[in-house]
Amino acid sequence: MAEHAGRRCCLGWDFSTQQVKVVAVDAELNVFYEDSVHFDRDLLEFGTQGGVHVHEDGLTVTSPVLMWVQALDIILEKMKASGFDFSQVLALSGAGQQHGSVYWKAGASQVLASLSPDLLLHEQLQACFSISDCPVWMDSSTTAQCRQLEATVGGAQALSCLTGSRAYERISLVSSFAASLFLGSHSPIDYSDGSGMNLLRIQDKVWSQACLGACAPHLEEKLGLPVPSCSVVGAISSYFVQRYGFPPGCKVVAFTGDNPASLAGMRLEEGDIAVSLGTSDTLFLWLQEPTPTLEGHIFCNPVDPQHYMALLCFKNGSLMREKIRDELASSSWSEFSKALQSTEMGNSGNLGFYFDVMEITPEIIGRHRFSAENHEVSAFPWDVEIRALIEGQFMAKKIHAEGLGYRVMPKTKILATGGASHNRDILQVLADVFGTPVYVTDTANSACVGSAYRAFHGLAAGTDVPFSEVVKLAPNPRLAAAPTPGASQVYEALLQRYAMLEQRILTQTRGPPE
């Protein structure tokens, strides 16, 4: 097809929980091709639900590794059939669902290096994996091992680490496994995804001997040395050159995790924060100096090796907002917005905590309402309740972000995504609580697009070009809300009260802190 011909580009891949996706991005940073394979729908023979198998114990959750390989075959064949011009691909990179692991058999590297272009990948790699069903991020079958690791290294964050005596040649994350397919050899783990394993010392970017020793013997040689996330890990395998027409000089840039790739796709810069307002709410933070705590996850930054990124997840997100909307605003977002418009910033000192499911950050359940005098009350007027919910959700986000070392800077901007980002009144509260402007951007396929951006950055990284320079042509986000004058004074005192009351609830439910 003509529209796919003659455009020099980079490819971005995303090996996510439910599908494999690809985008092609040209030198002007326009997405001009995208495709996907959905595991449940397009690969019925694997019998997955939501891309996974949940085992009888209810704790073990796995995905068939050959399903991921076959999905890649299908997409590449579809691209070929559509007339996609692979000869124009300068580089590629990708993302993988975080915390999944792939176990290569001894001898797999020889198979990867000598693939026949006459056969599909999944036809040749069937005997290459020690474990055919890979544990993924939803797996919680290793709780005992996590506790043991914590005890061994004196309170390290939990790690799902399988041990055993099988002949593993190499252990990959989903990201480095996918890169290995394109490379024709074992790809190293990148710093950013590697820092989600609780085995990497994030300050000096080397494996922690204490954590490795707590998990399994000879683990370091199975993992290989980690590399910077913008590294070119090699040229594409001759298999792809011969079967699809990739140029021999096409570079493979280290693959990373889906969350770090999304940070790249949203083009966060130093001091920025992204808020994904979905079923659960997730914060992406760009940090200079992290303050590791028992909350959240801190990773090496995928686009700046000197800095860090953090993730904070809040379970009571859109479902909680929708529940209050249905209870108090006649299931109408416009009525919900009227409540926010008719109540004042700071809600006359009334504060609320709304956790219908056990929250992660912090570990609280239930609804708790407090008057301006910090007395717990049983109910608020309907409009006060709605503002208390939204203000409380955003104050919690700011407090816990600051707990990880985040500080609002003069040039800070918030990027809002997800369903609630379409409601300007909710975004106004977000701007007021944080005291910084809120922007919205189209982040469909952000991990995929971020991977293509990272491929361009990998091509330029040898010259120390900053990521922001590489992606300056990408579409700019749109301003959605600016802080109301006087907002910072209103919320400065409220934030202190909110943190104090949160601690009071925690103490009441689980006793005083040790």
Could you tell me what each predicted segment is?
Residues 59, 79-135, 162-166, 179-201, ...:
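Short beta-strand-loop/turn "lid" adjacent to the catalytic site in phosphate-handling enzymes
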Residues 1-123, 241-251, 431-438, 465-470, ...:
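N-terminal glycine/serine-rich phosphate-binding loop of ATP-dependent small-molecule kinases
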Residues 2-5, 11-12, 21-27, 86, ...:
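Active-site core segments that coordinate phosphate-bearing ligands/cofactors
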Residues 68, 88, 97-100, 130-133, ...:
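Generic hydrophobic, aliphatic-rich segments that mediate packing or membrane embedding
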Residues 216-228:
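A conserved helix-loop-beta module that forms one wall/lid of the active-site cleft
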Residues 36, 134-135, 226, 252, ...:
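Conserved beta-strand scaffold positions in the cores of enzyme catalytic domains, especially
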Residues 37-39, 137, 298:
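A generic structural motif
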